[in-house]
Amino acid sequence: NGITKHIIKKVYKKKYKIQKIDGLPQKQVTPPKEVYERIKSDNKLIGKARAVETDLTFFSNKFKPPLKNAIITGVYGSQRILNGIPKSPHYGLDFAAKEGTKIKAMLDGVVTLAENDLYYTGGTIIFDHGHGVSTLYMHLKDVLVEEGQKIKQGDLIGTVGSTGRSTGAHLDIRLNWFNIKLDPMSVLDK
């Protein structure tokens, strides 16, 4: 209608949780030098899978939770302190679940990465939902999809595991817009 509005909103600093995990094997806190090249290669695969830009518009639909009745044990933005060493914030949402629990696709998408054994994330799936929006599912025991496969919301895509850098069976999900990390909780249909 030709009307322009200017709205000023105050931005508040958010306090994030601090998660301290002690008693981890040293290789889970600081990887040995001999795996640096592997980690670099894994990061390239993940970066390439998240950089996909398509005209799909699946992201405009409601995201459904990937697990039924799961307990959230890790939240976006929380500071991780492993064996007393501060690490990067956690950019995902962790769901505790029994190993082998079925994981469902949160949204329609196209698989851009399906790997069974990445160093940090273990069994990993990345979906393209259009215009740079992607979701990641990590630490899977079983990856049941293939790159290029089209998936519908609610389809079985894998099972919960404790692969990669993990202290127990759980599912870690991530939401990205290209390389920008977003809080998955902000889009999950409750």
Which ranges hold each PLM region?
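Non-catalytic extracellular/periplasmic "stalk"
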Residues: 1-76
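Catalytic cores of peptidoglycan-degrading enzymes
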Residues: 65-190
